[in-house]
A protein has these predicted regions:
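Switch/communication elements of ASCE P-loop NTPase nucleotide-binding domains
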Residues: 1-36, 192-337
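Acidic, Mg2+-coordinating catalytic modules of nucleic-acid enzymes
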Residues: 4-9, 298-302, 311-402
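Conserved P-loop NTP-binding catalytic core
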Residues: 6, 13, 24-78, 83
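Short alpha-helical "patches" and their helix-cap loops
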Residues: 42-47, 230-241, 348-355
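A general structural signal for short secondary-structure junctions and capping/turn motifs
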Residues: 43-45, 78-87, 207, 275-277, ...
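Short polybasic amphipathic segments
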Residues: 46-67, 190-198, 305-311, 355-358
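Coupling/switch segment of ABC-type P-loop NTPase heads
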Residues: 71-171, 331-338, 342-344, 348-357
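Extended helical coiled-coil dimerization/tether regions that scaffold
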Residues: 118-244
Length: 402
């Protein structure tokens, strides 16, 4: 399996279990030399698995390497020496966990391993701090940091507000911070709130799953950028000039209206965060959403963007680049090879239409067959379905009442 990611948008599509998350895990490892969700373990011998990877880096030139799996130690060895610097890397997992790699904080020389390889957050650690069960924190967590930033009224909260505005589901449903407040007798922390479109301030911990995921992404992006700037200043180095987002099921928990906006928002989020226009964003996202693909039609450029299909062919998983063309709407994407649906309808409606189309091709259909298929259509299609015009004309041409 070989994939040559494009420089901006990369969608991974395919049925469940064919390897989208596998590719995201492997991409994270190639960029950071760490595993976000545990080591990928290959098949049993006699196979001799290896991962070959290459990418451009901040300094001139391209980095390339090959790692061969060592079965005795169950590791994928890396080349010795300084690891390359791909830029900031953020990996959003579908269960609400996140991983962050920062070249200013996780970039080590020789065998100096006092610094963490990366920051791996379980879902509860995003909110409660990392590590959650120790008093000394690498990250205070969303609840504490948000309240502190808001009280401080400094650049971090200004950045958070801009990022939330950029990632909001629509102009009519902005993600506006409310007033932090205590929400439980057993927890004296002041919890962040959001002002809902209906005017009520709702604690973030009680918000919907979709809002919590996007707010978590916004928080970690600001936390990463703030800590990166401070660390880069201490090291006497310029800040990173690139960010890579790896996102598993980018549409998870999001209403279709939000699905339609999320990818353009992520591409523009660094401008909202930094106020600068020249920080490139690369997105590698797994998706099952035709709305997500339809949302980028006006931006898609085959020189910088790609859709990668994973298909099962003859018992093997095959990866290929989808030949890009505008489909026009989400239904057309559903019936493309990316999703492989014959019809964007219920199974019963699809079967009824299949039978009807077969009958339309028949030279001498029987009255009984026409009546039987007509009953199936009436049971499955809506009264205003566009297929009724064709079916009604077919029945009239044969002088049959149906």
């Amino acid at each position: 399996m070989e994939i040559d990611f494009k420089s901006r948008i990369n969608f991974l599509a395919g049925d469940n279990g064919l390897g989208k998350s596998f590719l995201l895990d492997a991409a994270w490892w190639a960029l950071t030399r760490t595993w976000a969700r545990g080591v990928l373990l290959p098949h049993l011998p006699p196979s001799k698995p290896e991962i070959e990877y290459a990418y451009t880096k901040r300094t001139a030139g391209q980095y390339a390497a090959t790692s061969k799996f060592e079965r005795e130690s169950e590791t994928w060895p890396n080349q010795r020496g300084r690891p390359p610097i791909p830029g900031l890397v953020v990996y959003a997992q579908v269960d609400g966990g996140f991983s962050v790699w920062d070249p200013a904080r996780n970039y080590w020389k020789k065998d100096d391993r006092e610094r963490p390889d990366a920051y791996h957050f379980r879902p509860d650690e995003v909110w409660g701090g990392l590590p959650k069960d120790k008093p000394e924190k690498l990250c205070e967590g969303l609840v504490t940091d948000w309240a502190y930033w808001q009280a401080e009224k400094g650049p971090a909260f200004a950045q958070l507000t801009r990022v939330l505005e950029a990632l909001a589901p629509s102009p009519d449903e902005p993600l506006l911070p409310g007033s932090p407040r205590v929400i439980s007798l057993d927890d004296n922390r002041r919890h962040p709130t959001l002002v809902m479109p209906y005017g009520q301030e709702v604690p973030l911990v009680h918000a919907s799953a979709g809002i919590r995921r996007i707010v978590s992404l916004a928080y970690l992006l600001v936390w990463t950028w703030q800590a990166h700037l401070a660390s880069a200043k201490l090291r006497g180095e310029p800040p990173a000039r690139q960010i890579i987002f790896l996102i598993d099921e980018i549409e998870a928990h999001l209403h279709p209206q939000w699905q339609r906006r999320i990818v353009p928002a992520i591409l523009d989020v660094m401008e909202a965060l930094t106020g600068e226009h020249d920080i490139p964003v690369q997105l590698i996202a797994a998706t099952h959403s035709p709305m997500v693909l339809a949302s980028v039609e006006t931006r898609f450029d085959t020189a910088h963007d790609g859709i990668w299909e994973l298909d099962l062919q003859g018992g093997d998983v095959v990866l290929s680049e989808f030949p890009w063309s505008r489909r026009g709407d989400a239904n057309a994407w559903l019936t493309s090879s990316v999703f492989d649906l014959a019809e964007p309808r219920s199974i019963e409606a699809e079967e009824a239409l299949r039978d009807a189309l077969e009958l339309l091709r028949c030279q001498t259909p029987s009255k009984e067959a026409v009546e039987r298929v007509g009953q199936k259509l009436r049971a499955a299609l809506g009264d205003t379905d566009r297929f009724w015009m064709r079916w009604t004309q077919f029945v009239r041409d044969r002088g049959q009442e149906n």
